Amino acid sequence: MKFLAQLQNPPREFTAIPFWFLNGDLTDAELRRQLADFAAHGIYGVVLHPRMGLSPEITYLGERYFALIRTAVEAAAALDMKIVLYDEGMYPSGSASGLVVKDHPELASEGITLTQTVLPGDELLAQTENGALVVRKSGGTMRGLHWGEDDGEKNAPLTADILNPEAVHRFVQLTHEAYYREVKEYFGSTIIGFFTDEPSILGRNVSGMFPWTHGFAEIFRRAGGNAANLAALFDGRENDDTRLYHKLLLQREGEVYYGTLSRWCEAHGIGLMGHPHQSDDIEVEKYFAVPGPVSYTHLRAHET
């Protein structure tokens, strides 16, 4: 009977934790009102998710932005609610809404492509019978927070190379360390985790390329790979080298990206949560304190 009673009135620890989209012209009063409304309807935790449509007056990770984050966290604490921090401005995660690359273009996403024309700046990986296999910047982007920064728009932020330890370190310094600096007294109590969302190695809006990073050629060679055989990737064929490539790529992503975030979260008293780039990337779930992708539905509030 106790079990049935808990099903009818579950403890707060079993609450749903929805994405709470932070956009528009946010105010302290409105944040407090919406959190109180969540609690009144049995929602005792939220993911603070900055989202497209954020006021241009609110700079991502800026002073006003963090003042609003503090308001939300303090209000949640007063309501005995839990907060999960979202580690990006929109998605995919890993670029701090373009800030990782802004002053460090060398940290932008890169990949390999098969081409008949080697361009200045290309790194020749192998010459094959179907063309040159070269490494170049992918030009991949992410969805931004402000109007004019969405997919296909000229100000869409560039994505960072999440296989590059230096890029991931910069992402953590810009994002995780900034949140900790601003609201560290709530880590491990009100704040229980960081949510990373579908990190993409190439970024969005990229075609004709496969992920790569500086130093990966040597990793591949030492594992017994022949780079010339990766030309098969571009016509959908498989061979021992394409299978080795995918295996090493996932290992690298796990160690450099997910592993770094997981260790940071553990060291700061919270857990890594999130959605891998591919929902069936089971191997990387070992880095998550709360494994498993998200469930997508919508909670709509009526304006008053």
Could you tell me what each predicted segment is?
Residues M1-E13:
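N-terminal carbohydrate-binding accessory modules
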Residues W20, A76, F194, C265:
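Conserved, mostly hydrophobic/aromatic
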Residues R33-H49:
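Catalytic domains of carbohydrate-active enzymes, especially glycoside hydrolases
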Residues H49-H169, Q173, K184:
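Acidic/aromatic-lined carbohydrate-recognition and catalytic surfaces
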Residues L61, S93-T117, S200-A231, E285-P293:
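Aromatic- and acidic-residue-enriched segments that line the glycan-binding/catalytic groove
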Residues V84-G89, F195-D197, Y257-D280:
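Aromatic-lined carbohydrate-recognition surfaces of secreted/lumenal glycan-active proteins
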Residues R237-H268:
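Active-site neighborhood of glycoside hydrolase catalytic domains
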Residues T297-T304:
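Conserved small/polar residues in nucleotide/adenosyl-binding loops
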